[in-house]
Amino acid sequence: MSKGTLFDKVWDAHTVQILPSGQTQLFIGLHLIHEVTSPQAFAMLRERGLKVLYPDRTVATVDHIVPTENQARPFADYLAEEMMQALEKNAQDNGIRFCHIGSGDQGIVHVIAPEQGLTQPGMTIACGDSHTSTHGAFGAIAFGIGTSQVRDVLASQTLALAKLKVRKIEVNGTLAPGVYAKDVILHIIRKLGVKGGVGYAYEYAGTTFEAMSMEERMTVCNMAIEGGARCGYINPDQVTFDYLKGRDFAPTGENWDKAVEWWQSIRSDADAEYDDVIVFDAKDIEPTVTWGITPGQGIGVSEVIPIPDSLPESDRAIAKEAYEYMQLSPGAPIKGTKVDVCFIGSCTNGRISDLREAAKFAQGHHVSPGVKAFVVPGSERVKVQAEAEGLDKIFVEAGFEWREAGCSMCLAMNPDKLQGDQISASSSNRNFKGRQGSSTGRTLLMSPAMVVAAAINGQVSDVRELVS
């Protein structure tokens, strides 16, 4: 059993009581809601005559269903418009702050909360979205929850949860040029598997994570769920504090000093006990690309698609399914795989630092003929900042489309979708069958820089060669 970890300290600080079931009734400090998983939850409240208990601890935005080309209302998709109107009404009726389109604050829920300073160390955070683990980058314990749990948090500001075990994942060393946080997390998921973290919270530690910016740390924690972990976190440090200071909802004055003192106290103790510890070396990580239908089916860009005999027996059935669906051959190099669509964005890689890095490689080049490439900022604030820096012009001159903020092609809930059996090079987080809108569409996950390299060459390419 873990002891003295940040997870234990934050969990204990938010424990209301131990329930007869053995679960913990856990107080939730921040509840983030969006248009997809909240309408039914609000409907259940109305059926019971209940109101939102703590509207000041609840923040709403719209992200999943919003079009990124034409955002004029009403939306062309009547179901999307219906969800939008429902969220607007539910937020207004319950006194919830709503970051609506055009407010300057709208965007993907896991992008706007950190950039506004809503996400802070030591918090418990819940959202009806799988990638809520993103907020763990700040030293928060953040869970994705289902619609019935969204209802519970709205009504009681608590959740009934079983306490998780804690696994420390340590990565040490300096990442080579062309290797990014996205490659680190894809490498970890490849090694530990998509179910390896079931029942665990992951603590990411070591010199590699310590050297990362907050936005890079968010990329890592965002995909903790893809490795089976319920949440993932990084201990807060000066990088965290520097990022938060001065943001809209960050403490100020004496309250800031008190907050930092507490944030430092919740760091995992030097002698903390973990349920498991796994260590990786940064030098073993290269630009990584997924070849299959789970985020765990990834390989270095210099490798070949694994042959069945090289895989553990337990992985062979899903590998066979992946070969057939992806129309890729075992033993073939992943490098050179043709791509049709290139997407940069999502709650994994749609922040300003992601766009800066992508623009660096796009500048002076052009998207290959026949390839559709587009960039979707993670929030309105990211879009404004990118345009102030001229990044939009770099992308457009290179042949990329420049869009409005939203989830876009990460998932098939808005107009940005693959067609037929197109292959996409995507900076998003999931490569499941049909994830990007076509039942036969295929997704290759990679870093934004690698997406640019693929767009320029029309095929999976090694971004390190683009540098040279």
From Swiss-Prot:
Alphabetized InterPro entries for the sequence: 3-IsopropMal_deHydase_lsu (IPR004430), Acnase/IPM_dHydase_lsu_aba_1/3 (IPR015931), Acoase/IPM_deHydtase_lsu_aba (IPR001030), Aconitase_4Fe-4S_BS (IPR018136), Aconitase_4Fe-4S_dom (IPR036008), IPM_dehydratase_rel_enz (IPR050067), IPMI_cat (IPR033941)
Pathway this chain belongs to: Amino-acid biosynthesis; L-leucine biosynthesis; L-leucine from 3-methyl-2-oxobutanoate: step 2/4
Gene3D superfamilies assigned: Aconitase, domain 3
Top EC class of this enzyme: lyase
E.C. number: 4.2.1.33
Molecular function via GO: 3-isopropylmalate dehydratase activity; 4 iron, 4 sulfur cluster binding; metal ion binding
Catalytic activity: (2R,3S)-3-isopropylmalate = (2S)-2-isopropylmalate
Keywords: 4Fe-4S, Amino-acid biosynthesis, Branched-chain amino acid biosynthesis, Iron, Iron-sulfur, Leucine biosynthesis, Lyase, Metal-binding
GO biological process, alphabetically ordered: L-leucine biosynthetic process
UniProt key word Iron-sulfur: yes
Cystine residue pairs: none
Binding-site list for [4Fe-4S] cluster: C347, C407, C410
SUPFAM superfamilies: Aconitase iron-sulfur domain
Record note on cofactor: Binds 1 [4Fe-4S] cluster per subunit.
Cofactor list: [4Fe-4S] cluster
Family according to the record: Belongs to the aconitase/IPM isomerase family. LeuC type 1 subfamily.
Oligomeric and partner information: Heterodimer of LeuC and LeuD.
Job description of the protein: Catalyzes the isomerization between 2-isopropylmalate and 3-isopropylmalate, via the formation of 2-isopropylmaleate.
Protein name: 3-isopropylmalate dehydratase large subunit
Organism encoding this protein: Rippkaea orientalis (strain PCC 8801 / RF-1) (Cyanothece sp. (strain PCC 8801))
